[in-house]
Amino acid sequence: VLAIVCDGMGGHQGGDVASTMAVTHLGHNFSMTDFADANLAHKWLDVQLNSENETILKTADKFPDLNGMGTTIVLAFAFDKNALIAHLGDSRAYSYSEGKFVQLTEDHSLVNELVKMGQITKEQAKHHPQKNIITQALGVSSTIDPEFDEIKMGGNDIILLCTDGLTNSLSDPQIQQILATKELSLRERCNKLISEANRLGGGDNITVCLIWNKEDESSDR
């Protein structure tokens, strides 16, 4: 299973084009593969992301109205009892396992760099005037350095992929509480995350994807 979430930037049209290109091209190319190995997937994804970065840059150069377009990307390749995570930008991946909610990715953003340098706190970063400045994305620079992480997936573990529209509106404890609601199906939990983020003032596009390693039906994701 390959799940991808993108958040376009560079104007309404440009952002939509860049994010659609990334999801469509990677999804199509993945459908023609048959590997189930993290090392092969890592190499394949690295090549694909660099190729897509070049394609978006060339498309933006060809069409003036798309100049400056780009997109964040976060993806998860789930196989057997493992998952390979890759990302560029501030769209995030989380895991929910045995009651623990863990952020798997580190934002490629200016404010996160300031937090790491100790110049601002995580709380200050949430409201910083430059919080939307991204340091890595597809289609922004001729070179990219995607980050990869491999995790184990136990029975009933959930991986959450999301744009910053969700995390700007809901805190980690609020997200965790919804994911922990076993009475809700996976789709219902996904819909509730989005509706709660909108209810609490979500002014940005909100995209959420959940991958569930369901214990009794491992293919139900």
Show which residues each predicted segment covers.
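PP2C/PPM-type serine/threonine phosphatase catalytic domain
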Residues: 1-221
